[in-house]
Amino acid sequence: MFPPRRLNVKYLRRLIWYVSSRLLVLCCVLGLMTMAFYFSMNATNVYIILKDGMAKRAQVVMMGAEEELTPYFSPAYLERDPQLVQARSGQSPYQAYYTITGFDHRISLDRFWCWPWEDTARATITERIPAIDGKIRPSAREAAAAAGMSTSAPKWQTTQYTVLLSRENGVWHIRNMTVVRLLDDQ
């Protein structure tokens, strides 16, 4: 004999709830995985932009190399970056007195946050250059001594920055950098 009709509806309702609850859990897990993927992708892209962009910036400041910085920085920020303005006006002590042949540039990403659906990101980074290879120019030896400069290149100030980045046409650019604090070299 067949069970009463009411019993069939009960089992059907249970089946629907079971399937729908599992689908909801599956959708939530897939959504979280998608968000984690995009967060990781943004974090990787931002780290590469910060690492390469800050290294090129230091190269321009120390070596006077006219590297193209627009792939990393917004043009508006390049016009108001104090170290770049000083270097481009010829007032950088690295360019005035020394011949810099290389340096060890390090960036540590202290904090980062960007929602996957936003086009702006904030990061806190620490920039340090523990070693600068270079020597004083023979023609600038007297001027450097008068300015109180040593024969070896001056140390780079280790600095912690808050960086604001924006994504334009799928490409991240550093839009603003604010000094959080100056750190002692360790």
State the predicted function of each range.
Residues M1-Y18:
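N-terminal Lys/Arg-rich, disordered targeting/topogenic segments
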Residues V19-S40:
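Hydrophobic membrane-insertion alpha-helices, especially the h-region
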Residues A36-L109:
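Core segments of small alpha/beta cavity-forming domains
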Residues I100, C114, P154-W156:
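Sterically constrained small-residue positions within well-ordered secondary structures
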Residues H105-R111, I174-M177:
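Generic structural motif
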Residues D110-T120:
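Short edge beta-strands and adjacent turn/loop segments
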Residues D119-Q186:
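Exposed beta-sheet edge and beta->alpha loop/turn motif
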